[in-house]
């Protein structure tokens, strides 16, 4: 009986470690930037399987999943509390391989994962090397097909939307399975 309890006591921490060890490791890209009343942080991790299928490049055809974590800053005038995810933004990216000058562009989509909502896309990189990432972030009013209302009356109104902003970062991609990669 004693051995049964000892085995159970060892199995619980081990199973928890294995469960949490399976989580994806996010690699920060530069430092978060404060722009337009928002904190804009960029990360990458291994490519992600998404639903609905076909909403972005399949994970098997991608090198990384790029993410923009965009949260309201303390000075936000649009009614969001500090740290709130800011929805309905229009986010696109430009990724330049600084070693060869090749540029690729795309759009980030809003999505949710176990660490919360963010904007992202699966991306096929142009091999290992140094990259420059530009994130172009526009307010909800930039998308004429997605409506996100804003109170403008004297009693309950919020400030006007921010002007579009650009966050720029540089990072080294070592390749999959390499130190400094995921």
From Swiss-Prot:
Transmembrane parts of this sequence: none
Signal peptide: 1-24
InterPro entries: Metal-bd_Tp34-typ, Tp34-type_sf
Highest taxon in the source lineage: Bacteria
Alphabetical UniProt keywords: Signal
Similarity section: Belongs to the UPF0423 family.
UniProt protein name: UPF0423 protein BAB2_0840
Source organism per UniProt: Brucella abortus (strain 2308)
């Amino acid at each position: 009986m004693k051995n049964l309890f000892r085995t159970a006591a060892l199995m619980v921490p081990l199973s928890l470690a294995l469960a949490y060890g399976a989580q994806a490791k996010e690699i920060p890209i530069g430092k978060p930037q404060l722009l337009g009343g928002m904190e804009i942080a960029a990360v990458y991790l291994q490519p992600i399987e998404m639903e609905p299928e076909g909403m972005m490049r399949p994970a098997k055809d991608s090198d990384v999943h790029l993410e923009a974590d965009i949260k309201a800053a303390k000075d936000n005038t649009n009614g969001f509390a500090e740290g709130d995810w800011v929805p309905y933004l229009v986010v696109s990216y430009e990724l330049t391989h600084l070693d060869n000058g090749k540029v690729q562009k795309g759009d980030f989509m809003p999505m949710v994962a176990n660490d919360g909502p963010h904007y992202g896309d699966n991306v096929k990189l142009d091999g290992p090397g140094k990259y420059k990432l530009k994130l172009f972030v526009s307010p909800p009013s930039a998308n004429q097909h997605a409506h996100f209302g804003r109170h403008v009356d004297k009693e309950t109104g919020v400030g006007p939307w921010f002007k579009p902003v650009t966050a720029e970062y540089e990072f080294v991609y070592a390749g999959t399975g390499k130190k400094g990669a995921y």
